[in-house]
Amino acid sequence: MRLTAKQVTWLKVCLHLAGLLPFLWLVWAINHGGLGADPVKDIQHFTGRTALKFLLAALLITPLARYAKQPLLIRTRRLLGLWCFAWATLHLTSYALLELGVNNLALLGKELITRPYLTLGIISWVILLALAFTSTQSMQRKLGKHWQQLHNFVYLVAILAPIHYLWSVKIISPQPLIYAGLAVLLLALRYKKLLSLFNRLRKQAHNKLSL
């Protein structure tokens, strides 16, 4: 039985709640001592993990819709992507304001360059910003064939973000490894498309070098 448009609308409502409830919990935890001994790090890791969860969920939609024969599920992909960007922005903001502090924001650029794991993080955020900004149907029509080329960069984020997470923790625990493993699995489901993209980029680079 296929999902109806009305059911997908209710599913979107549930996904909005899934994006909002972690924020409400975080606010409660901050005000009621629900965080650990290092609340700043806890906030950073919580916001980053939540962004990663929405990224993985967005990547899951296409294969799930295909294998379950539920084409209307695709309509939830943009929503998941926007929540991923929202949480990634909270993640970046928590680092800038809580780790560096308002008086040291001038150091942010230096930090992003000199710390490789932060470099990977900011590259991922910039890509997500571009994808969020161009996620509307009007931008899709305006960009034409370039729209899909741009949104293929989500696969780069799926590589960089788990590495950023693994690199940022001082002690490797199962959690970042699980996220990395899930990202690898979701990318493996698209190996034909990724191989095609790689061959196309390699061909374009070869043609430019030959000029």
From Swiss-Prot:
Disulfide bonds: none
Subcellular location: Cell inner membrane
GO biological process: protein repair
A GO CC term attached to the entry: plasma membrane
Cofactor info, note text: Binds 1 FMN per subunit. Binds 1 heme b (iron(II)-protoporphyrin IX) group per subunit.
One Pfam match: Ferric_reduct
Subunit: Heterodimer of a catalytic subunit (MsrP) and a heme-binding subunit (MsrQ).
Name the record gives this protein: Protein-methionine-sulfoxide reductase heme-binding subunit MsrQ
Organism this protein belongs to: Escherichia coli O6:H1 (strain CFT073 / ATCC 700928 / UPEC)
Gene (name only): msrQ
